[in-house]
Amino acid sequence: MANVAGESAETVSTQMTAVWNNFDDGSKSLEYYADVMTALGAATASSTAEISEGLQKFASVAETVGLSYEYATSALATITATTRESASVVGTALKTLFARIQGLQLGETLEDGVDLNKYSEALDKIGVSIFEANGEMKAMDDILDETAAKWDTMAKAE
């Protein structure tokens, strides 16, 4: 990956250690994680260095709310490529977003009065439930998949 990314082996090692520590569940190799970043960097106007820098900002929170490595890297690469904000800024924004969701999962009410019920009600209006049949909150990947499936049917105000 160092050759493809144009980074030093030391830099890539640090980046991949952060990814490995937060996303590894034993089912994928380190090469897989590197390949995903390299492919996303090539497919978007972002680099593997940007993707890994941003991931270091929010990976631990993303994993906690059930956001997979694939979704996390895709979101980061897409937002970075689209906005051209620095990966650090995008990563911090995603960390804040997912930390808020994590707090809502734990039953907190945010400073603006928003609680999980308000998010749940908004998504219910478009036919997306954030809860499993047993009352547990679904993984973020599943919520995003269901929301994406409804995207074309939503009005602009939604």
Regions found by a protein language model. Give the residues of each.
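Amphipathic alpha-helical interface segments used for oligomerization, scaffolding
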Residues: 1-158
